[in-house]
Amino acid sequence: MKVVLQRVSEASVDVVNELGTLDPTFEPQQIGPGFMILVGVTDEDGDKQIAWLAHKILNLRVFEDAQGKMNRSIQDIGGEILSISQFTLFADVHKGNRPSFIKAGKPEHADLMWIKFNEALRSGGVPVKEGRFGAHMRVGLVNDGPVTIVIDTEHDMPDGTR
């Protein structure tokens, strides 16, 4: 799994239908201070990656304390998460000018892993709002910092836990 995490003061998502207008079947989602995360899944990802990544995000100390140091977690500040599934995080651009997405997980597997991942985040007591898997979305955010961190279970998980 790969996550691009951005610390935000606010973020929102809408779903756009095939006519290019807002999809009336999707209720727009908004959060206040917290994280907007883009989530990519491969076919090799499973429960171990979900548990490790959710724990890492819930405990990541990137919010400032009274002394202005990044020393507080999203749980500490009572923040929220906006989770957006994004297969394009696994784009391969080595050959030519058109990206290949062969490394991205198959939709059925990726959707299930994304749902389980969001539940793992919620189990840490943090409200999680979501986009719609596989949909064309408009995502808005106000970066705070900015603080942007890429976490990739393939490279960041300690050996022996993958």
UniProtKB/Swiss-Prot annotation:
What's the EC number here?
3.1.1.96
Gene Ontology terms: cellular component: cytoplasm
Domain of life the protein comes from: Bacteria
* Listed Gene3D superfamilies: D-tyrosyl-tRNA(Tyr) deacylase
Has keyword Cytoplasm?
Answer: yes
Q: What class of enzyme is it?
A: hydrolase
Q: Mind listing the GO biological process terms from this record?
A: D-amino acid catabolic process
Q: Which UniProt keywords apply?
A: Cytoplasm, Hydrolase, RNA-binding, tRNA-binding
Where is the motif (Gly-cisPro motif, important for rejection of L-amino acids)?
145-146
Provide the assembly information: Homodimer.
Q: Which family does it belong to?
A: Belongs to the DTD family.
Q: What does this protein do?
A: An aminoacyl-tRNA editing enzyme that deacylates mischarged D-aminoacyl-tRNAs. Also deacylates mischarged glycyl-tRNA(Ala), protecting cells against glycine mischarging by AlaRS. Acts via tRNA-based rather than protein-based catalysis; rejects L-amino acids rather than detecting D-amino acids in the active site. By recycling D-aminoacyl-tRNA to D-amino acids and free tRNA molecules, this enzyme counteracts the toxicity associated with the formation of D-aminoacyl-tRNA entities in vivo and helps enforce protein L-homochirality.
Quoted from the entry, the domain comment is: A Gly-cisPro motif from one monomer fits into the active site of the other monomer to allow specific chiral rejection of L-amino acids.
What is the name of this protein? D-aminoacyl-tRNA deacylase
Q: Which gene encodes it?
A: dtd
